[in-house]
Amino acid sequence: MANTASARKRIRQNERRRERNVARMSRMRTFIKKVELAIQAGDKSAAAEAFKVAQPEMQRAAGKGVIAKNTISRKLSRLSARVKALATA
């Protein structure tokens, strides 16, 4: 239990930040799912468009510190490769 005013304030701040981070992470996952669904459906243009929309959202999450930058780079690279493979197939 927090005894000082500053500790209580930190608890409030942490809770607000956690809620924000959860929302950002959820939003990012939703965009990724849209890309993956388009890839599974075999829809080249929809996959490319969904990826185009998902990319800045994922980078924004990394910029805000919700997820590590290297993790986002890896995920973007793999998604991009899958979209590209779909376009050439």
Curated annotation (Swiss-Prot):
Residues 12-22 have a biased composition (Basic and acidic residues). Keywords: Ribonucleoprotein, Ribosomal protein, RNA-binding, rRNA-binding. One of its GO terms (molecular function) is small ribosomal subunit rRNA binding. One of its GO terms (cellular component) is small ribosomal subunit. Residues 1-22 are annotated as: Disordered. GO terms for biological process: translation. SUPFAM superfamilies: Ribosomal protein S20 (SSF46992). It holds the Pfam family Ribosomal_S20p. The keyword RNA-binding applies. Belongs to the bacterial ribosomal protein bS20 family. Binds directly to 16S ribosomal RNA. This is Small ribosomal subunit protein bS20. The lineage of its organism: Bacteria, Pseudomonadati, Pseudomonadota, Alphaproteobacteria, Acetobacterales.
